[in-house]
Regions:
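N-terminal lobe/hinge region of extracytoplasmic solute-binding protein
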Residues: 37-87, 118, 190
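Ligand/substrate-recognition segments at binding pockets and active sites
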Residues: 206, 244-247, 263-265, 329, ...
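Periplasmic-binding protein-like
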Residues: 270, 296, 300-340, 387-388, ...
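Extracytoplasmic/peripheral linker and loop segments enriched in polar/acidic and small residues
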Residues: 353-354, 404-419, 444-515
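Structural transition elements
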Residues: 195, 329-366, 380-387
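Long beta-strand-rich cores associated with HINT superfamily self-processing modules
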Residues: 513-534
Length: 534
């Protein structure tokens, strides 16, 4: 019997020989270039306008942050030389490291930092919370500025240094003054990070290139997550966009590329047999799959219809579609990342119990589903989203819903999901994505559990749940971790009722890279500093 897995593996093996025949770079030049197959096509460059990880990952090479989280989730100085905090906890004074410069040669100033924080805070989940307690920003001089708060906010430095989208990247003031709801121009991708973006070589759908900034001065501390010294060991970082998994596997086997960010689980056995390839899991919190509803338009503006669909969804189906039959590569998940202090099983029988399709059909009818079209926008160029979308599409058909399956690429999904129009005017009803486990570890950075509707900084889908917002606010001022965990239990119960999204499970995808590539850092995403190649 020819299974999907066998067919893909055979296809990858068949394409190895042609890949080997292509000309190779000279050894010296090859050592200075890191060639990566990223998880998606890079179509959007503004990491404040979008939460897309592909944009965030590239942005970390270009822009830097005032603080960076280490592997213990502690904020460490990055662009900041240090900070002071007043005794009442309401005045932060941040001092920049001397000599920081943007890639255009201009110095990094306090004015750049203040403008960047303001733009970021308009879009980011925890940034929005910080903005509500900020009294004023005050520039003292080019290297020092103050953040004066109305009340203490213990997560201030965490917010400025977290790697979760949206990241508080520091941009030149003129760029940071861009409307938060508009994208910056490609020519304004200018940061102070270890690499410069090569706009003239950017070919969406094929190639994105960054080159080492010779003027960048890394911190002295060892690199740890997104903190410490960001040492650029390559003259060029090349992202090769290869949507076809078999072709990507063949390129890795032949040495045409050095690193494949999200190898297809069906091809793990093939890759493991190659002694020149290493598969290694670098993200201990894994990833969380989700199905996102558009709650502005029928049919999923109706919570009963959302609940009817969720009652038929089986996390095992989604996880096996992503990682195959190896049960060690996935776990059932609720609304907070399994294994973290805020996670619990409260209410999760609604997601884990037996699935009854006939009961779900009856629930849809009782909820008033009138055969409205359901537009599922599916990114087929990313296996993680494609697999989930296929499971949902089959489920919708079995439930008798009027499915319009729009197979497209991730770049198009990123653009289309921003539309608030009804489906007849180019809108959408459903899409799948995933979040790094870190991003769902607590309410602070958890953008998809927000219930702020179409308010400032709301995320695509625009669910409205006043109770979720009340509980989130309470979490920030809770007196202890135990009290916070209790709040998260209630948040999970409310989320199961209101369903801002449906979690499809927690999964673990290793990086696949050539054995001569070393120094890849553990973290919630691929980090391109500290890496070397022999």
């Amino acid at each position: 019997m020819i299974t999907r897995r066998n067919a893909l593996a055979a296809g990858a093996a068949a394409t190895v020989a042609p890949a080997l025949a292509r000309p190779a770079l000279a050894q010296g030049a090859a050592r200075n270039v890191l060639r990566v197959v990223p998880h998606a096509n890079l179509t959007v460059l503004d990491p404040i306008w979008t939460t897309a990880y592909i944009t965030r990952n590239g942005a970390f090479m270009v822009w830097d942050t005032l603080f960076g989280l280490d592997s213990q989730f502690r904020p460490q100085p990055q662009m900041a030389e240090g900070h002071t905090l007043s005794q009442d906890g309401k005045l932060y004074t941040i001092t920049l490291r001397p000599g920081l410069r943007f890639h255009d040669g201009e110095p990094v100033r306090s004015q750049d930092c203040v403008a960047s924080i303001k733009r970021w805070a308009a879009r980011d989940a925890i940034g929005q919370k910080l903005a509500t307690v900020v009294d004023e920003y005050r520039v003292l001089d080019d290297r020092r500025f103050e953040i004066r708060l109305k009340e203490p906010f213990a997560l201030t430095l965490f917010a400025l240094g977290k790697p979760a989208s949206n990241v508080c990247f520091i941009m030149p003031e003129r760029v940071a003054n861009t409307d938060p709801n508009a994208q910056i121009k490609p020519e304004d991708v200018i940061g102070s990070g270890p690499f410069r973006f090569k706009r003239d070589e950017w070919n969406p759908g094929a190639l994105a290139v960054w080159t080492r900034d010779p003027a960048y001065q890394p911190r002295a501390e060892p690199a740890d997550w997104v903190s410490g010294g960001k040492r650029a060991n390559f003259e060029r970082i090349e992202w090769r966009i290869i949507p076809d998994a078999a072709t990507a596997a063949a390129a890795l086997q032949s040495g045409e590329v050095d690193w494949w960010e999200t190898p297809l689980a069906d091809l793990f056995p093939l890759l493991k047999r190659d002694r020149n390839i290493v598969l290694e899991q670098m993200n201990p919190l894994g990833e969380i799959g989700i199905l996102r509803f558009n709650q502005l338009h029928p049919p999923f503006d109706n919570p009963e219809i959302r609940r009817a669909l969720a009652s038929a969804m089986n996390q095992a189906d989604y996880m096996q579609a992503i990682v195959g039959d190896d049960s060690s590569l996935w776990k059932n998940a609720g609304f907070f990342t399994p294994g973290t202090p805020m996670a619990s099983d409260v209410g999760l029988d609604a997601l884990k119990g037996p699935r009854d399709l006939e009961a779900a059909k009856r629930a849809l009818a009782a909820a008033g589903y009138k055969n409205e079209k359901v537009v599922l926008i599916a990114a087929t160029d990313i296996p993680l989203t494609h697999a989930q979308s296929q499971v949902t599409a089959e489920l919708l058909r079995r439930l008798g819903m009027n499915l319009d399956y729009v197979a497209t690429d991730w770049g198009t999904v990123v653009q289309r999901r921003a539309s608030r129009e009804p489906v007849e005017r180019g809108g959408w009803n459903l899409f799948h994505t995933w979040w790094a486990g870190f991003d769902h570890a607590n309410p602070a950075a958890h953008l998809s559990i927000r219930g702020n509707g179409t308010g400032p900084g709301s995320w695509f889908g625009w669910p409205t749940s006043p109770r979720l917002e009340e509980l989130r606010d309470a979490w920030f001022i809770a007196p202890s971790e135990a009290a916070q965990a209790k709040i998260c239990e209630e948040m999970q119960v409310v989320a199961l009722r209101d369903l801002p999204y449906v979690p499809t499970g927690q999964f673990f995808i290793p990086f696949a890279f050539r054995r001569n590539v070393t120094g890849i850092l553990k973290g919630p995403m691929p980090l391109f500093w500290n890496v070397t190649k022999s």
